[in-house]
Amino acid sequence: MADDLEQQPQGWLSSWLPTWRPTSMSQLKNVEARILQCLQNKFLARYVSLPNQNKIWTVTVSPEQKDRTPLVMVHGFGGGVGLWILNMDSLSARRTLHTFDLLGFGRSSRPTFPRDPEGAEDEFVASIETWRETMGIPTMILLGHSLGGFLATSYSIKYPERVKHLILVDPWGFPLRPTDPSEIRAPPTWVKAVASVLGRSNPLAVLRVAGPWGPGLVQRFRPDFKRKFADFFEDDTISEYIYHCNAQNPSGETAFKAMMESFGWARRPMLERIHLIRKDVPITMIYGANTWIDTSTGKKVKMQRPDSYVRDMEIEGASHHVYADQPHIFNAVVEEICNSVD
């Protein structure tokens, strides 16, 4: 990370940094515990150790439901297992649900990723497959949101025999970057803010550079998150969770930066590769009707997979975080898909 703006300072400044940046893995653990205590169904939270010494923080809900294909949920950029709290009980009513912090995010290990787009992507995918092997999951219904959707698709290209149904929720990184600016959807304020600080720094570097003002920045730029989870939390629990997830060593964030082009696009767009997924893998794409993501991608995927099952749909009243904007509708749609599998 020698050429990043986030080099660790030396000497007296390095000992002062923990006070300047009010975060720690312990604080992330504590705020996540407040979130997970809202679960009604039986759950198990633990580290899954991979052969390469990395650890993947994993939450399994309803582990006793062993008769059906499990649902595996992969969060998006800057997220973690806690953001599925509005969905986990409902979606684990009839089957086991697994979710985990992606390598480099949340409470999982934060190793150094390859600096090239393909290498970074492969590292993510390899960690998901090794996690699956270690967990002993033969097949799964694989759901990914945003960056998680991009990685779930990449995984399905490489390991199609493990995926009973691929569910992509407002997936990032599919279309090619338009050459005509008029074809680009206007991004929300927080995306513009991230884009404005890009360059040599990581996307969320501002949270770490801001020190004690970092938590306030989350609340300022993403006040919608507090509203989305208001049924569960009246305080700043979710804002705190997002801050502590992203104020740590920016390992996965650096990998994402290697994979992206101007935040909204991928250097290796998935539309150029989605045809490589085996024909018998069904795909459902779920978008928020008000998302900043290009929803025409669903129709383009259908065109590229004429002999395969591809369904795309939009949920009214939802933006990019469909699962939190309209959780009841989202849960019903995903449950219907899962029931079609078994």
Curated annotation (Swiss-Prot):
Gene Ontology MF term list: lysophospholipase activity
InterPro entries: AB_hydrolase_1, AB_hydrolase_fold
Gene3D superfamilies attached to this UniProt entry: alpha/beta hydrolase
Domain AB hydrolase-1: 70-323
EC number: 3.1.1.-
Catalytic activity: N-hexadecanoyl-1,2-di-(9Z-octadecenoyl)-sn-glycero-3-phosphoethanolamine + H2O = N-hexadecanoyl-1-(9Z-octadecenoyl)-sn-glycero-3-phosphoethanolamine + (9Z)-octadecenoate + H(+); an N-acyl-1,2-diacyl-sn-glycero-3-phosphoethanolamine + H2O = N,1-diacyl-sn-glycero-3-phosphoethanolamine + a fatty acid + H(+); N-hexadecanoyl-1-(9Z-octadecenoyl)-sn-glycero-3-phosphoethanolamine + H2O = N-hexadecanoyl-sn-glycero-3-phosphoethanolamine + (9Z)-octadecenoate + H(+); N-octadecanoyl-1-(9Z-octadecenoyl)-sn-glycero-3-phosphoethanolamine + H2O = N-octadecanoyl-sn-glycero-3-phospho-ethanolamine + (9Z)-octadecenoate + H(+)
Tissues in which the protein is found: Highest levels in the CNS and in testis, intermediate levels in liver and kidney. Hardly detectable in heart.
Keyword Magnesium tagged: no
Coiled-coil segments on the chain, per record: none
Keyword Lipid metabolism: yes
UniProt entry keywords in alphabetical sequence: Hydrolase, Lipid degradation, Lipid metabolism
Matching Pfam families: Abhydrolase_1
Mutant phenotype after disruption: Homozygous knockout ABHD4 mice are born at the expected Mendelian frequency, are viable and healthy, and show no overt differences in their cage behavior compared to that of wild-type littermates.
GO biological process, alphabetically ordered: lipid catabolic process; N-acylethanolamine metabolic process; N-acylphosphatidylethanolamine metabolic process
Recorded family membership: Belongs to the peptidase S33 family. ABHD4/ABHD5 subfamily.
Function of the protein: Lysophospholipase selective for N-acyl phosphatidylethanolamine (NAPE). Contributes to the biosynthesis of N-acyl ethanolamines, including the endocannabinoid anandamide by hydrolyzing the sn-1 and sn-2 acyl chains from N-acyl phosphatidylethanolamine (NAPE) generating glycerophospho-N-acyl ethanolamine (GP-NAE), an intermediate for N-acyl ethanolamine biosynthesis. Hydrolyzes substrates bearing saturated, monounsaturated, polyunsaturated N-acyl chains.
Protein name per UniProt: (Lyso)-N-acylphosphatidylethanolamine lipase
Source organism (scientific name): Mus musculus
